[in-house]
Amino acid sequence: MSAYCGKYKDELIKNAAYIGTPGKGILAADESTGTIGKRFASINVENVEENRRSLRELLFCTPGALQYLSGVILFEETLYQKTKDGKPFVDVLKEGGVLPGIKVDKGTIEVAGTEKETTTQGHDDLGKRCAKYYEAGARFAKWRAVLKIGPNEPSQLAIDLNAQGLARYAIICQENGLVPIVEPEILVDGPHDIDRCAYVSEVVLAACYKALNEHHVLLEGTLLKPNMVTPGSDAKKVSPEVIAEYTVRTLQRTVPAAVPAIVFLSGGQSEEEATLNLNAMNKLSTKKPWSLSFSFGRALQQSTLKAWSGKAENIEKARAAFLTRCKANSEATLGTYKGDAVLGEGASESLHVKDYKY
């Protein structure tokens, strides 16, 4: 049997290509209730549904922002929420030319017999949930696998379990009309150098595409969401140009040309760092058969959150900060960002959280 060719085939290909449109990218607004609670705590905002809804309305209804986005990843709660005027967020996004997406994994669990390595859960009722989300207007999905670099990590067991888990998720999504974002995140935690990150990234991505192939996943109807290839959080930093070179080389060696787009996670980089690194990749004149874009959460929202601080009177200021980051990242997907965005408070601070849980 070859790749998936069921009733959603053409729609999957069209939607995946659209999300990868140069000049556009993805806002990851799918933080779990617990994670958004930590963000709110940092700005002294209570973690209740109305505040979560207000933040999402602030983002999705920022005038001019949606032109820079092709997709927004939602948490299940947000998929069914509305603006204060009663308009479903899904409709707001669609009218702005943005595809709604949905986080479908149910978090990580430890793999017994390993050094606290993890695999991701959520396969059991996944088909049923995907069908329900498609019905509600979602057109793509996200599933995060997490690997770490250590003296003996990632183990072959963790690599294989996570690759197989991602592939199972991907084919179930496609059978239910959702474009799967395949996210094998290799955490930045640790003192390793960029060569070690590049090597591990190659091994992990090769395993993922082998598994996707074995599960007959239609690659043209998928997206990859990898980490950038960088030194560990406790190692000496390198320039965006070096990160770009290592990252693109790693992708050239592992990601088939059939994949329409690669949308990077920011992995705790500061807002400005993530944008500069993406820009450097798009400036590289080398073979890139896929578009290189963003799927940023913290790196699109940090200065916006700080400007807002949960106060209605700060909404305009917060929206200006959000628009600035959306525009900067849009330019970075074209390799035209000049590093001239007005930096809001928090735009250049590291957003790294050790052993980050989404």
UniProtKB/Swiss-Prot annotation:
Positions annotated to bind substrate: R39, S266, G267, G268, R298
Major subcellular site: cytoplasm
Site residues (Necessary for preference for fructose 1,6-bisphosphate over fructose 1-phosphate), renumbered to this chain: Y358
Localisation per UniProt entry: Cytoplasm, Cytosol
Chemical reaction(s) catalysed: beta-D-fructose 1,6-bisphosphate = D-glyceraldehyde 3-phosphate + dihydroxyacetone phosphate
Record EC number: 4.1.2.13
Active site (catalytic residues): E183 (proton acceptor), K225 (schiff-base intermediate with dihydroxyacetone-p)
GO molecular function: fructose-bisphosphate aldolase activity
Keywords, in A-Z order: Cytoplasm, Glycolysis, Lyase, Schiff base, Stress response
GO cellular component, one term: cytosol
Any single biological process term in GO: glycolytic process
EC class of the enzyme, as a word: lyase
UniProt key word Cytoplasm: yes
PROSITE patterns: ALDOLASE_CLASS_I
Tissue-specificity statement: Expressed in callus.
Induction field: By gravity stress. Induced by gibberellin.
InterPro entries, per database record: Aldolase_I_AS, Aldolase_TIM, FBA_I
Biological pathway: Carbohydrate degradation; glycolysis; D-glyceraldehyde 3-phosphate and glycerone phosphate from D-glucose: step 4/4
SUPFAM superfamilies hit by this protein: Aldolase
Subunit organization: Homotetramer.
Protein role: Fructose-bisphosphate aldolase that plays a key role in glycolysis and gluconeogenesis. Involved in gibberellin-mediated root growth. May be regulated by CDPK13. Associates with vacuolar proton ATPase (V-ATPase) and may regulate the V-ATPase-mediated control of root cell elongation.
Additional observations: Plants silencing FBA1 display reduced root length.
NCBIfam families linked to this entry: FrucBisAld_I
Family membership: Belongs to the class I fructose-bisphosphate aldolase family.
The protein's name: Fructose-bisphosphate aldolase 1, cytoplasmic
UniProt source species: Oryza sativa subsp. japonica (Rice)
Organism classification: Eukaryota, Viridiplantae, Streptophyta, Embryophyta, Tracheophyta
